[in-house]
Regions:
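Acidic (Asp/Glu)-rich catalytic clusters
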Residues: 179-186, 216-230
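Flexible, glycine/charged-enriched surface loops at secondary-structure junctions
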Residues: 107-112, 150-153, 223-237
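Metal- or metallocofactor-binding catalytic centers and their adjacent structured scaffolds
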Residues: 58, 64-148
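Glycine-rich, mobile lid/loop segments that gate access to catalytic sites or pores
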Residues: 140-144, 148-214
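Conserved small/polar residues in nucleotide/adenosyl-binding loops
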Residues: 240-242
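Well-ordered, non-membrane alpha-helical segments in soluble/globular domains
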Residues: 82-96, 205-221
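Short, Gly/Pro- and small/polar-rich lid/capping loops
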Residues: 1-54
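Short beta-strand elements
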Residues: 53-61, 65-71, 180-193
Length: 242
Protein backbone atom coordinates (compact mmCIF):
# COMPACT_ATOMS: atom_id res chain seq x y z
CA UNK A 1 0.00 0.00 0.00
CA UNK A 2 1.44 3.34 -1.06
CA UNK A 3 1.86 6.55 0.89
CA UNK A 4 -0.45 9.16 -0.62
CA UNK A 5 0.45 12.24 1.40
CA UNK A 6 2.30 13.54 4.47
CA UNK A 7 0.72 16.32 6.54
CA UNK A 8 2.17 18.24 9.50
CA UNK A 9 0.40 20.09 12.31
CA UNK A 10 1.84 22.11 15.19
CA UNK A 11 0.99 21.04 18.73
CA UNK A 12 2.07 21.17 22.37
CA UNK A 13 3.90 18.60 24.47
CA UNK A 14 2.98 17.44 27.94
CA UNK A 15 5.85 19.34 29.56
CA UNK A 16 8.05 22.37 28.96
CA UNK A 17 11.24 23.63 27.39
CA UNK A 18 13.57 24.90 30.12
CA UNK A 19 16.72 26.94 29.53
CA UNK A 20 19.21 24.83 31.46
CA UNK A 21 22.00 27.38 31.17
CA UNK A 22 19.80 30.09 32.70
CA UNK A 23 18.79 27.75 35.53
CA UNK A 24 22.44 26.98 36.24
CA UNK A 25 23.07 30.71 36.46
CA UNK A 26 20.47 31.07 39.18
CA UNK A 27 17.06 31.56 37.57
CA UNK A 28 14.61 31.11 40.44
CA UNK A 29 11.11 29.69 40.74
CA UNK A 30 7.84 31.58 41.02
CA UNK A 31 5.17 28.90 40.97
CA UNK A 32 5.54 27.07 37.66
CA UNK A 33 7.56 29.92 36.16
CA UNK A 34 11.29 30.57 36.21
CA UNK A 35 12.29 34.16 36.90
CA UNK A 36 15.13 35.68 34.93
CA UNK A 37 16.32 36.15 31.38
CA UNK A 38 16.97 33.25 28.98
CA UNK A 39 20.51 32.78 27.70
CA UNK A 40 20.20 29.86 25.26
CA UNK A 41 19.52 30.64 21.62
CA UNK A 42 15.84 30.44 20.65
CA UNK A 43 14.40 30.80 24.16
CA UNK A 44 12.04 33.72 24.76
CA UNK A 45 11.69 32.82 28.47
CA UNK A 46 13.52 30.51 30.86
CA UNK A 47 10.50 28.18 30.80
CA UNK A 48 8.43 27.88 27.64
CA UNK A 49 5.64 25.57 26.59
CA UNK A 50 6.92 22.45 24.91
CA UNK A 51 6.15 22.38 21.20
CA UNK A 52 5.53 19.37 19.00
CA UNK A 53 4.81 18.55 15.38
CA UNK A 54 2.28 15.84 14.59
CA UNK A 55 3.19 14.02 11.40
CA UNK A 56 0.32 12.30 9.61
CA UNK A 57 1.02 9.80 6.85
CA UNK A 58 -2.02 9.26 4.65
CA UNK A 59 -2.24 5.89 2.95
CA UNK A 60 -3.92 5.31 -0.39
CA UNK A 61 -6.86 3.51 1.26
CA UNK A 62 -7.56 6.55 3.48
CA UNK A 63 -6.00 5.28 6.69
CA UNK A 64 -3.95 7.85 8.60
CA UNK A 65 -0.81 7.03 10.57
CA UNK A 66 0.43 9.34 13.30
CA UNK A 67 3.76 10.27 14.86
CA UNK A 68 4.67 13.10 17.22
CA UNK A 69 7.94 15.01 16.89
CA UNK A 70 8.93 16.23 20.35
CA UNK A 71 12.20 17.23 21.98
CA UNK A 72 13.64 17.01 25.47
CA UNK A 73 13.10 19.53 28.26
CA UNK A 74 16.65 20.90 28.15
CA UNK A 75 16.85 21.51 24.42
CA UNK A 76 19.94 23.31 23.19
CA UNK A 77 22.05 22.36 26.23
CA UNK A 78 24.93 19.94 26.69
CA UNK A 79 25.37 19.16 23.02
CA UNK A 80 21.67 18.53 22.40
CA UNK A 81 19.92 19.63 19.24
CA UNK A 82 18.57 23.21 19.26
CA UNK A 83 15.22 24.34 20.60
CA UNK A 84 12.47 22.57 18.65
CA UNK A 85 9.93 25.15 17.53
CA UNK A 86 7.19 23.96 15.19
CA UNK A 87 7.37 27.01 12.93
CA UNK A 88 11.05 26.35 12.28
CA UNK A 89 10.87 22.61 11.63
CA UNK A 90 7.58 21.96 9.83
CA UNK A 91 9.14 23.48 6.67
CA UNK A 92 12.11 21.10 7.04
CA UNK A 93 9.80 18.08 7.19
CA UNK A 94 7.77 19.33 4.24
CA UNK A 95 10.83 20.10 2.12
CA UNK A 96 13.04 17.10 2.86
CA UNK A 97 11.04 14.26 4.44
CA UNK A 98 7.70 14.48 2.65
CA UNK A 99 9.16 14.06 -0.87
CA UNK A 100 11.10 11.00 0.28
CA UNK A 101 7.95 9.30 1.52
CA UNK A 102 5.43 10.21 -1.19
CA UNK A 103 4.50 7.26 -3.40
CA UNK A 104 6.54 4.76 -1.40
CA UNK A 105 5.20 1.38 -0.37
CA UNK A 106 4.46 1.28 3.36
CA UNK A 107 5.85 -2.20 3.84
CA UNK A 108 9.38 -1.80 5.22
CA UNK A 109 9.71 0.07 8.52
CA UNK A 110 13.47 -0.29 8.88
CA UNK A 111 14.19 0.50 5.25
CA UNK A 112 12.08 3.66 5.18
CA UNK A 113 13.54 4.81 8.50
CA UNK A 114 17.09 4.25 7.26
CA UNK A 115 16.44 6.48 4.26
CA UNK A 116 14.85 9.13 6.44
CA UNK A 117 17.76 8.97 8.90
CA UNK A 118 20.21 9.50 6.04
CA UNK A 119 18.72 12.86 5.06
CA UNK A 120 21.02 15.79 5.78
CA UNK A 121 20.21 19.50 5.80
CA UNK A 122 23.19 21.82 5.42
CA UNK A 123 25.50 18.92 6.21
CA UNK A 124 23.69 17.95 9.41
CA UNK A 125 21.33 15.12 10.29
CA UNK A 126 17.68 15.91 10.83
CA UNK A 127 16.78 17.18 14.30
CA UNK A 128 16.34 14.28 16.72
CA UNK A 129 12.71 15.32 17.30
CA UNK A 130 11.98 14.94 13.59
CA UNK A 131 13.62 11.51 13.43
CA UNK A 132 11.74 10.49 16.58
CA UNK A 133 8.31 11.54 15.30
CA UNK A 134 8.64 10.56 11.65
CA UNK A 135 9.85 7.08 12.62
CA UNK A 136 6.72 6.74 14.78
CA UNK A 137 4.53 7.70 11.83
CA UNK A 138 6.37 5.28 9.52
CA UNK A 139 5.92 2.47 12.05
CA UNK A 140 2.20 3.22 12.36
CA UNK A 141 1.85 3.42 8.57
CA UNK A 142 3.52 0.05 8.00
CA UNK A 143 1.39 -1.50 10.74
CA UNK A 144 -1.84 -0.14 9.26
CA UNK A 145 -0.86 -1.03 5.71
CA UNK A 146 -0.03 -4.63 6.60
CA UNK A 147 -2.76 -5.27 9.16
CA UNK A 148 -0.45 -5.67 12.14
CA UNK A 149 0.11 -4.02 15.49
CA UNK A 150 3.13 -1.72 15.72
CA UNK A 151 4.77 -4.05 18.22
CA UNK A 152 4.33 -6.92 15.75
CA UNK A 153 6.06 -4.92 13.01
CA UNK A 154 9.01 -4.25 15.31
CA UNK A 155 9.19 -7.89 16.38
CA UNK A 156 9.03 -9.15 12.80
CA UNK A 157 11.65 -6.75 11.43
CA UNK A 158 14.10 -7.14 14.30
CA UNK A 159 13.69 -10.89 14.74
CA UNK A 160 12.31 -10.80 18.27
CA UNK A 161 9.01 -11.62 19.95
CA UNK A 162 6.26 -9.48 21.40
CA UNK A 163 6.51 -9.39 25.19
CA UNK A 164 3.77 -11.16 27.09
CA UNK A 165 4.23 -8.84 30.06
CA UNK A 166 4.11 -5.03 30.30
CA UNK A 167 7.36 -3.17 29.60
CA UNK A 168 8.46 -1.04 32.61
CA UNK A 169 7.89 2.67 32.04
CA UNK A 170 10.03 5.41 33.60
CA UNK A 171 7.82 8.14 35.06
CA UNK A 172 8.90 11.74 35.66
CA UNK A 173 7.71 13.89 38.55
CA UNK A 174 8.94 17.26 37.38
CA UNK A 175 9.55 19.88 40.06
CA UNK A 176 6.72 18.65 42.32
CA UNK A 177 8.69 15.59 43.31
CA UNK A 178 6.77 14.81 46.52
CA UNK A 179 3.10 14.96 45.51
CA UNK A 180 3.82 13.47 42.10
CA UNK A 181 5.77 10.61 43.69
CA UNK A 182 2.61 9.81 45.65
CA UNK A 183 0.66 9.64 42.38
CA UNK A 184 3.26 7.28 40.96
CA UNK A 185 3.07 5.02 44.00
CA UNK A 186 -0.73 4.90 43.83
CA UNK A 187 -0.55 3.93 40.15
CA UNK A 188 2.25 1.43 40.78
CA UNK A 189 4.73 3.07 38.40
CA UNK A 190 7.51 0.60 37.67
CA UNK A 191 10.37 3.14 37.58
CA UNK A 192 10.28 6.46 39.43
CA UNK A 193 10.56 9.40 40.04
CA UNK A 194 13.24 11.24 37.97
CA UNK A 195 12.68 14.19 40.39
CA UNK A 196 14.40 16.88 38.31
CA UNK A 197 17.33 17.59 40.65
CA UNK A 198 18.56 20.79 38.99
CA UNK A 199 19.48 23.16 41.83
CA UNK A 200 22.23 22.78 44.43
CA UNK A 201 20.71 24.99 47.10
CA UNK A 202 17.12 23.73 46.99
CA UNK A 203 17.32 20.14 45.73
CA UNK A 204 20.82 18.69 46.02
CA UNK A 205 22.44 20.40 48.99
CA UNK A 206 26.05 21.52 49.16
CA UNK A 207 27.06 18.03 50.32
CA UNK A 208 24.19 16.08 48.77
CA UNK A 209 22.22 16.15 52.02
CA UNK A 210 18.95 17.37 50.48
CA UNK A 211 19.04 14.65 47.85
CA UNK A 212 19.79 12.02 50.50
CA UNK A 213 16.88 13.30 52.57
CA UNK A 214 14.58 13.00 49.57
CA UNK A 215 15.72 9.47 48.74
CA UNK A 216 15.10 8.37 52.33
CA UNK A 217 11.65 9.96 52.24
CA UNK A 218 10.87 8.24 48.93
CA UNK A 219 11.98 4.84 50.21
CA UNK A 220 9.87 5.18 53.36
CA UNK A 221 6.91 6.53 51.41
CA UNK A 222 6.88 3.51 49.12
CA UNK A 223 7.20 1.05 52.00
CA UNK A 224 4.49 2.80 54.02
CA UNK A 225 1.93 3.59 51.33
CA UNK A 226 2.20 0.77 48.79
CA UNK A 227 -0.87 -1.41 48.44
CA UNK A 228 1.08 -4.62 48.98
CA UNK A 229 4.64 -5.94 49.23
CA UNK A 230 4.72 -7.03 45.60
CA UNK A 231 5.22 -3.40 44.58
CA UNK A 232 8.98 -2.87 44.47
CA UNK A 233 9.74 -0.16 41.92
CA UNK A 234 13.15 0.80 40.59
CA UNK A 235 14.32 4.21 41.85
CA UNK A 236 15.96 6.40 39.22
CA UNK A 237 16.91 10.00 39.93
CA UNK A 238 18.12 12.47 37.34
CA UNK A 239 20.72 15.09 38.22
CA UNK A 240 21.59 17.69 35.62
CA UNK A 241 25.18 18.91 35.52
CA UNK A 242 25.05 21.39 38.36
Amino acid sequence: MKIKDVVCAAGSTGFYFDDQRAIKRGAGHDGMFYIGQPVTEGFSAVRMKGEAVSVMIILEDGQIAFGDCAAVQYSGAGGRDPLFLAKDFIPIIEQYVRPMLLGREADDFRGLCAQMEAIEVNGKRLHTAIRYGVSQAILDAVAKATGRLMCEVVADEYGCTVSQTPIPIFTQSGDDRYDNADKMIIKRAQVLPHALINNVQTKLGEHGEKLLEYVKWLRDRILTMRADESYQPVLHLSLIHI
